[in-house]
Amino acid sequence: MSPAHALPSGEGAVSKADRDPERLYRRVTWRLLPLLIVCYTFAYLDRVNVGFAKLQMVADLKFSDTVYGLGAGIFFIGYVLAEVPSNLVLHKLGARRWIARILVTWGILSAAMLVVNSPTSFYVLRFLLGVAEAGFFPGIIYYLMHWYPASRRGTVLATFYLAAPLSGLLGGPVSGYIMTAMAHTPPFTAWQWMFLIEGIPAVLLGIVVFFTLDDRIDDAKWLSADEKLRLNAELASEQHQAASSTVGSAFRDPRTWHLSAILFAIVMAMYGVFFWMPTLVNESGIKSPLLVGLLSAIPYAVAIPTMILIGRHSDRRAERRFHMIGLCFTGTAGFLLCVLWQHQTWPLLFALTLATAAVMATLPLFWTLPTAIFRGAAAAAGIALINSLGVTAGFVAPYMVGFLRDLTKSPNSGLYVLASLWVIAAVLIYKVPAQMRTQMANVEELNK
């Protein structure tokens, strides 16, 4: 996957496409994003549907909250170990083949969760699922870098990230329905049917991606020569603003580690919500799996327009940091209100909605930062490294919350820790180095 290519000289070289760049980018977006959003929706669903399985699985298999939290989180150990190698392979082989491989293998392993019968099998399959899915999200971020300039990525990434709340919006009711409808259908239990049914679409999507996704702008038969020149020209114009560096330099760059720390704090809060929301709703007095699924969809439904509006506003203002800081404090308020209203279903849902909408709107803005400062192999390695270090929080968060629940017999201590992490994230975002802020501003200004 290469960046922009050399362009022919002459004033008329990109004149046709240049007359309506918005129309051109809308066309690109409609071609790429619907398929990628659907794929990531199932990635999120297969990652977090264990939260709905918990409503019955822990009783059937006699798991404690600590066992569940460790199993939910161990996914991210496999994910982290395979993340950077996976993204470097994508850089060499191209997005089409590697993303298709990721989809097929994670779909098979997600369906295989139905054979879990002990803590050991739970841990092993969740670990392997993490290995299988590694590289998908940073690979998509890296892929979109080669289609959109920095000034458009806030909206584009916010649109792509709609997959996360969509998985909650659709996955909650669907998971609840499957577990209700298949409750007495042999040869499996309801939660086993849920894993099997929800794993199959990823395999089918892998086949679709293999035959339809274009690796590069120049491979897209649905674009004219003028349109390809226009897209390549916009990418070429910003390349000198980004650091030209190697894979090793991304590992040595202190900006990589600063951004990883920010992402770690954000992801801690995110998976604190995702893996435990069904349990919190259930403990507020809702016992039906279907109703838990329907009510758990409400925060995600609100997150969708929030992400779009915040992403567009951030692009128009060409400003990321203070948008993110405001969202961090909104998320803090959401977690603290969860403590206050944990036994009142509708107020609790309002608090969960604040926390969910805040984290969902923050993440696409975060990913505009590394895509503005790295390029080439350094971008592939830097994005994967930031993502892999950040998502280690996906292991820590569910395990920590489960351990604290077992230790204190209450959800409050875990919620207080998650609220504190939002404050830490806000401070780290505010402390983004001046050099990084200047470089981001230069790229944004260049693409206005």
Segments (PLM) and residue ranges:
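C-terminal transmembrane helical hairpin of 12-TM major facilitator-type secondary transporters
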Residues: 320-369
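Glycine-rich segments within core transmembrane alpha-helices of 12-TM secondary carriers
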Residues: 155-179, 201-202, 387-397
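Cytoplasmic helix-loop-helix junction between adjacent transmembrane helices
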Residues: 125-162
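Helix-breaking motifs and short loop linkers at transmembrane-helix boundaries and internal kinks
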Residues: 62, 94, 115-121, 132, ...
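Cytoplasmic membrane-interface "Motif A"-like loop-to-helix N-cap segments
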Residues: 91-103, 315-328
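Helix-to-loop junctions at the C-terminal end of transmembrane segments
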Residues: 82-94, 306-319, 405
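Extracytoplasmic gate region of multi-pass secondary transporters
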Residues: 50-51, 248-311, 363, 367, ...
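Conserved MFS/SLC helix-loop-helix module at the cytosolic interface between two early adjacent transmembrane helices
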Residues: 81-120
